[in-house]
Amino acid sequence: MTESDYVRSRRGRRDLAIFHEFHEPPYGGGNQFLLALRAELVRRGISVEVNRLSGRTPACLYNSFNFDFHRLERFARDGVRMVHRVDGPIGVYRGFDDGTDGRIVEINALADATILQSRYSLEKHRELGLELRNPLVIHNSVDPAIFHPRAEHEPLGDARLRVITTSWSDNPRKGSEVLRWLDQNLDFGAYEVTFAGRTQQHFERIRVVGPLASQPLADLLRAHDVFLAASRDDPCSNALLEGLGCGLPAAYLRSGGHPELVGDGGIGFDAAEELPAAFARLREELGERSAAIHVSPLSDVADRYLEALRQ
């Protein structure tokens, strides 16, 4: 940022600043959610600036550690409502501690309030002694124009149950053990399994589709019956929310934020060996479980973000 850019920014105004390194999809879940949130706010006529904080902009949302913190520090000033959206704990989620969570706590010192994405995330931060300023929980959501159920549900009859799982990250904690077990042990005469995204694994019987942009991903999700959420210690899986948003009940690992996101819209499991029974039960209860799905509407989530940013 040049000095002239900085001086020019002091004279401007937007309704809200967002600090996050945005990427075109396909990309990670936090990026997907923030793209949807920004689009919802813009649809409402709220003016948003990205990675700058003009002199008369009254509020700023900054995301986890995915931005230039030194830039934010330079722009920050008294009188701006600062809200920090926090993921993780990152060390638990990734399976190793590289100091990122400590850095997030340091960055959090600028915040007037902190948004965490699940009760699990809030409680896990507290358990680890990671104190965040004025925390509140707001689940993520999805863009309903893209991730919505199909118009009609055809009865399965004797067809195989179509199971899908997705992941942008190829971290093994995204469910690699579960997928390996399914590839070797599941009855593929009764089930078909699709993985969409990035993986380091080679499968013999699971179909693999590369990373997809949002619309083709949603179309692929709607061509299936059940979503498999096998990631471990995932605070608020956007992949899971996208599957639920497309009307797919979930078979979910009882870990992280999965149970609070799914509720009665799926069946939990603790080990891969339980999945054949879970899939069989979901097949029998498909209509009932689909009807129980609840994803917080994007409009409601945006309202809660705005409330936090305006207090």
Explain the meaning of each model-derived region.
Residues 154-174, 180-184:
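Conserved donor-binding/catalytic core segment of Leloir-type glycosyltransferases
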Residues 232:
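Aromatic "clamp/platform" in nucleotide-sugar-dependent glycosyltransferases that forms part
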Residues 152, 284-311:
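A charged, aromatic-enriched C-terminal amphipathic alpha-helix characteristic of glycosyltransferases
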Residues 120, 141:
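Carbohydrate-associated surface elements
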Residues 245, 249-252:
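Short hydrophobic beta-strand element within catalytic cores of glycosyltransferases
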Residues 59-61, 74-92, 115:
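Active-site proximal beta-strand in glycosyltransferases
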Residues 108, 219-224:
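Short alpha-helical donor nucleotide-sugar binding micro-motif in glycosyltransferases
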